[in-house]
Structure formats: structure tokens, C-alpha cells
Swiss-Prot record:
The gene is rnc. It comes from Proteus mirabilis (strain HI4320). GO terms for biological process: mRNA processing; regulation of gene expression; rRNA processing; tRNA processing. Keywords: Cytoplasm, Endonuclease, Hydrolase, Magnesium, Metal-binding, mRNA processing, Nuclease, RNA-binding, rRNA processing, rRNA-binding, tRNA processing. Residues 155-225 form the DRBM domain. Its EC number is 3.1.26.3. This is Ribonuclease 3. One of its GO terms (molecular function) is ribonuclease III activity. Digests double-stranded RNA. Involved in the processing of primary rRNA transcript to yield the immediate precursors to the large and small rRNAs (23S and 16S). Processes some mRNAs, and tRNAs when they are encoded in the rRNA operon. Processes pre-crRNA and tracrRNA of type II CRISPR loci if present in the organism.
Length: 226
């Protein structure tokens, strides 16, 4: 692995690893090695959820559980994590198998998002919970400052449905048009058909649910509600 790129990545993360093998594992997709990052991803997902929930709890003392859950979902969802990954220029450091490299896996949102979670797990194991909490809060500083409770935090499918119901229009239909990849690493493509948009709107994700949410989000953008 390119030492210069790894050093630049650690600088952007705001953390230098003591155990380089943890960093290497966090950057390794299952297509590249049997010692991949999925266990670290599992750990990082739980840590991220706790840190963001704790931050929202103290930042919004009068907000109810529903709004806090929606804000947390916005902050920890895949496209937010993929945005962070692109800010870190993480794609250049990923260890991918030949098939994923050929298909552009270093750009795929799901792989980028999963790797951010794996890095969180790796930093925790390399240090402690207080350290990773401080690092996550630094990464999310602007996003936490900008987020607020309300309808904007409802998931895209809910907002699209409420918009259409409010105008007495038919509910959207979601159709799976493609499933790509092996069972452990699939990518779904969904077409969403709604009144007011002539052509189906496309969404992609690592599950049918995520692809439907992505399609609904694109529909909201086309309806100029985002």
C-alpha cells in the first residue's frame, strides 16, 4: 500500500494508528482478502450510532425520541458516510479485489460507507471509546451544527408518500430492475414511478430498502422538494 497515501489519510482522519495492521484491515474489502473489514464495520456501526445518539440527546434536550431517531438516521445513513469518505479521499486507499477494482468499487457508496464504519471500529480498538468519540464529533462538527428536528428528517419514502397523499395523487410504485453482485455483496437498482415525473426515477443500494430510499430521494429532488 502507498505509504504517502496512507499517511495523508491518517492526517485527514485526525488519527495516527499505533497498530498499522488495524488500519490495513479496515481498508480491506472482502473481495481482496479473507482478513477483511466486516467485523470492524459491525463494531464501528454500533459505536457511531451511540456517539451520534449521545450528541443529539445533549444538543436537543426538548426534542422527542421520534425526531432524535430521524436526525440520527440522517447522520449515520450510507450517503452521509460516503460523503465523509470522499472528504477523506478514502477511495484511493481501499484494498479491493480485481473484480471490484474493474467495476469501480472505489467509487461505490456502499463500500465507502462501510469502510468509514470499519475505520471507526479500528480506531476504537487502537485507542479507546473517548478518543473515537472525540474524533467522530470532529468529523461531524458541521453536520451536527446544521441539523435540526422536523419533517426534513423523515426518510425520503415517507416524505414522498406524504407529499403525494397531500395532493390526492397515487402512491409511488417501486420495481427492482437489476440485482448485481454475489449474495454477500449485492447492489439493487430500483425504478420508482410517480405522478408528476414522466420517466421512472432510479435508485441504487445494498438492499432493496436502501435502493427504494435512494429512488425516493431522487424523486424529491426532481419534484424540487429537496
Amino acid at each position: 500500500m502507498n505509504t504517502l497515501l496512507v499517511n495523508q489519510l491518517q492526517k485527514k482522519l485526525g488519527y495516527t494508528f499505533k497498530q498499522n495492521e488495524l488500519l490495513l484491515q479496515a481498508l480491506t474489502h472482502r473481495s481482496a482478502s479473507s482478513k477483511h473489514n466486516e467485523r470492524l464495520e459491525f463494531l464501528g456501526d454500533s459505536i457511531l450510532s451511540y456517539v451520534i445518539a449521545n450528541a443529539l440527546y445533549h444538543r436537543f434536550p426538548r426534542v422527542d425520541e421520534g425526531d432524535m431517531s430521524r436526525m440520527r438516521a440522517t447522520l449515520v445513513r450510507g450517503n452521509t458516510l460516503a460523503e465523509l469518505a470522499r472528504e477523506f479521499e478514502l477511495g484511493e486507499c481501499l484494498r479491493l479485489g480485481p473484480g471490484e477494482l474493474k467495476s469501480g468499487g472505489f467509487r461505490r457508496e456502499s463500500i465507502l460507507a462501510d469502510t468509514v464504519e470499519a475505520l471507526i471500529g479500528a480506531i476504537f480498538l487502537d485507542s479507546d471509546i473517548q478518543n473515537i468519540e472525540n474524533i467522530i464529533l470532529k468529523w461531524y462538527e458541521n453536520r451536527l451544527a446544521e441539523i435540526s428536528p422536523g419533517d426534513k428528517q423523515k426518510d425520503p419514502k415517507t416524505r414522498l408518500q406524504e407529499y403525494l397523499q397531500g395532493r390526492h395523487l397515487p402512491l409511488p410504485s417501486y420495481v427492482v430492475v437489476q440485482v448485481r453482485g454475489e449474495a454477500h455483496d449485492q447492489e439493487f437498482t430500483i425504478h420508482c414511478q410517480i405522478s408528476g415525473i414522466d420517466q421512472p426515477v432510479k435508485g441504487m443500494g445494498t438492499s432493496r430498502r436502501k435502493a427504494e430510499q435512494a429512488a425516493a430521494e431522487q424523486a424529491l429532488i426532481q419534484l424540487e422538494l429537496e
